[in-house]
Amino acid sequence: MSENHPHVLIFPYPAQGHMLPLLDFTHQLVNNGVHITILVTPKNLPFLNPLLSRNPSIKTLVLPFPSHPSIPAGVENVKDLPANGFLSMMCNLGKLRDPILDWFGNHPSPPSAIISDMFLGFTHEIATQLGIRRYVFSPSGALALSVVYSLWREMPKRKDPNDENENFHFPNIPNSPKFPFWQISPIYRSYVEGDPSTEFIRECYLADIASHGIVFNTFIELENVYLDYLMKYLGHNRVWSVGPVLPPGEDDVSVQSNRGGSSSVLASEILAWLDRCEDHSVVYVCFGSQAVLTNKQMEELAIALDKSGVHFILSAKRATKGHASNDYGVIPSWFEEKVAGRGLVVRDWAPQVLILKHRAIAAFLTHCGWNSTLESLIAGVPLLTWPMGADQFANANLLVDEHEVAIRACEGAQTVPNSDELAALLAEAVQGNKVEERRLRASKLRKIAINGIKEGGNSFKELAAFVKHLREEATIIEA
């Protein structure tokens, strides 16, 4: 490609929380004159439809999904797997190495760079073999990735292999975070020295660290100390914070309603229900595209929502093929009738961006996934945290301890909350003594985030700097 239009291969990891922000970032790259090819497997192609309809110049590379004994036939996205499906999916996608190399070898004008998800570290080896650059796209924040990279590079071990509460300290990371072992990344906790699958995972993370640069969906004012730390840790300044990366047409109901799948309630009906509610009177409850509550967790959550007296929207994911369907995702039979009028239940996908931006929303009870975190902050909505795994415990600490826009509600993927305590927190989140303070702090972060992506803002400049870098590197590689 020419100097003004570098060609980049985008490779998203097939999970909604990973795909959607990278696809939104891809839209921004196209708007800045970058030529794009996106790599997906057949069943993930529909996720590209909104992007392709807006940007018909984007090319697609559709490669067959490799078979794997732990992934049911027909499943190509981790939304259809239980939480432990991440490891199998990461290993399985590594089988695409040779088909990708073949495609590059046969392309008349191949890409000069690969931008791939943080879980696809094997693409660094592909880029090195081809003599091009690989950039990590991180759908997690800088604090969380600092912890993850420290784990995989340093490989700390428990003193007592049976003590799940043993603290892991990270003294070199700003604010010296520490986490009990059970809160550490489950992918890291599953590591077995010499095991081919988990050794492959470790190699992927080390390849991330060795890649040419990292693009973060975060903003400087939210994670400045961690972004600075990572530049020192990596030994270079090729770290760009371009967030919050917003979806095109973020206020368009038709665009947002099916952005991540189908819903049991139309977006227009959800918004009409919210229109009938008072300002700052509704708690939105959602635990992301991956987590499915156990029936006992769901029972206690339902009791808490009932006892709290607050208006609410509950977005509840159903059990996937890998769950024991009788033990997960079942909403109590009494619940919906008892809370009719005061509560709205949405099964599977909910138009979260539209919900959070509505004037009626007072608080968000969340698993603290990074996309949910950013979507709440961009809407100026305080949070109730219930981290369950992955990067979520680090994100909760950032929200509660550092920015004071959240309060802790529960912790752990298997933890069953106390319904009385949770009911009190839900009520406090709507009309408690410190609600206004949290709302003001959240509103301040909202203004900072919005100004950052406007022309002249920090994230706007970071995006421009990254595109300039891609052009310069493409010129060098082509020469």
Segments the model singles out, each with a brief description of its role:
Residues M1-I220, N224-A479:
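Glycosyltransferase specificity loop/lid
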